[in-house]
Amino acid sequence: MEVGKINNVTIEHTPTGKYFAVLNIEFEPQPMNNKGGKIGIDVGIKEFYSDSNGNEVPNPKYLEKSMRKLMREQRKLSRKEKGSKNRNKQRVKVALVHEKITNQRNDFLQNESTKLIRENQTICIEDLKVKNMMRNHKMAQHIGSASWSKFFDMLTYKSVWYGNDIVKVPTMYPSSQTCSCCGF
C-alpha cells in the first residue's frame, strides 16, 4: 500500500440512510504498463460504444431494466400521506432503487474506462455537446442513462493519472469518411 498525504475527509449521507467517509489522498501515480495501442471510440445508444477495431460494447440500460420497479415504488410513494412515517419508509425504498441503478452504472463505467486505459496509450473520442443533445426530449432519457459525459470524464482523469493521451475529435470532422490507410 502506498503512503500518501490525506488532504481532507468528507462524510456523506445518502438518501437511503447510509454514511460514507470520502478520503481525498494525494500520491504520485504509478505508470501503467499498457499495450501502447491506439483506438477511436464512438458512443451510441444501442451500443454503448463502438471502437475503431470493430468491437462493440452493448449498452447495459440499467435504468430501462429497473423502470417497472421504480415506477411501482414511486406510485406507492405518491399514495402515502405527506409527513407520515410510512411515506418516509417508502421514500427510502425509492431511493434504494435509484441508488442501485447509480451503483450499477458507475461500476460499468469504471470497468470500461479502466479497460480502455490499460489497453491503449492513445484514445480518440468525439467532442460531443451532450448538454445540447439532452434537449431532444425523445432521446434525453437514453442519453442520460448511458452517462457519456461521466464516461468521458473518467477516461480523462484516468489518462492524466497514467500518462495516456486523450484526443478530442471535433464533431464536424469527417472521420468516418476518411480512409485511415491512404487518407482519402
Range-by-range predicted roles:
Residues 2-5, 13-184:
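Positively charged, helix-rich recognition surfaces that bind polyanionic ligands
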